[in-house]
Amino acid sequence: VYTSREVENPQSAARSKLTTLPSYPACWEQHKQAWEAAWDTSDILIEGDTQAQLAVRYSVFQLLIAAPWWDRQVSIPAKTLSGFGYRGHIFWDTEIFMLPLFIFTQPELARHLLSYRYHTLEGAR
């Protein structure tokens, strides 16, 4: 995915990128490896309560899929990627409720979330 922040013509850049991508099986293998690595560092285990385990894993999954791995100037929207409410707005409490997971499991990503606040500080004033 390209936007006008990165390139002059996002549609053309996307078409060009498609010609250089590996095969679907190769992409699938990379995808699986990336998720294995993410779960290796971010999983939270709850013994003796399967329902709680599933709920926590679902929550961690939502945070991982919405986290801005690629960009220090965006943050996690209020309903992550699973809801349309709030139209992608970022709220003040991201750092209170979401940042702790990333501080302990994905420190570089935690830095990205804090960088978002730094980059938007002038607009907040």
What is each of the regions a protein language model found here?
Residues D49-R57, M98-R125:
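Carboxylate/His-rich catalytic cores and anion/metal-binding grooves
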Residues G83-H89, T94-E95, P100:
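Segments forming glycine/polar-rich beta-alpha architectures that bind adenosine-containing cofactors
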